[in-house]
Amino acid sequence: SLADFTYILYSEFLTIDPENSDWDNRDRVVLSVGHTCMLIYSILYLCGYLKIEDLKSFRKLGSLTPGHPEIETPGIDANTGPLGQGVGMGIGMALAEKASSNSASKRYTYILAGDGDLQEPIALGASTLAGHWQLSNLIMFYDKNDIQIAGKTSRVDSTDYGKLYESMGWHVQEIDGHNHNEIRLA
């Protein structure tokens, strides 16, 4: 579902400019599930940010396609690594954008998060603030696939994150992450 969501996001919703990856008026994307970075690199290649040679250099020292996203790569807005870090960073970016932009700004910050991200206290603390502040320029896609490094997340976590985020003041929509129409309407 992360692949479907990311494809729809980049192909139909993001305001970006591959020829000017530092453009101030672009939307931001934070891949909190940094270990899935090859997905983003593939999308960045299709959008014109990267070359096929960059993809062939995946995880090589000094390449534009390291094993976790780094801002040296055109189209990457945040370095991420530890789970949950990207959630906090994305919320901080959305807050900074809201505080510094004019009222006509329509820029969004998108966070792509997974099960392991939301289990981290750094993500939950930042999410509490985002809900309280009602950051209308922030959208987080939570890929609830019940998988983590040691097996199913349900073995160690029974939290209903939809209800938890609603209690923190977030607008929550549960969708089929493989259904492109549901993604578009969310």
Kindly give the residue locations of the regions a language model identified:
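Glycine-rich, histidine-containing beta strand-loop boundary motifs that form or position
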Residues: V33, A113, Y142-K144, D176
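Flexible loop/turn segments at secondary-structure boundaries
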Residues: M38, L118-E120, I147-I149, N181-I183
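Cofactor-binding active-site loop characterized by glycine-rich and histidine/acidic residues
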Residues: S1-W133
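A short, conserved beta-to-alpha structural element at the edge of catalytic cores
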Residues: D77-T80, A130-D157
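Conserved thiamine diphosphate
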Residues: N102-R107, T153-A186
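Gly-rich Lys/Arg/Thr-decorated short loops/hinges at beta-loop-alpha junctions or inter-strand turns
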Residues: H68-G75, K106-T109, I139-I147, K163-W170
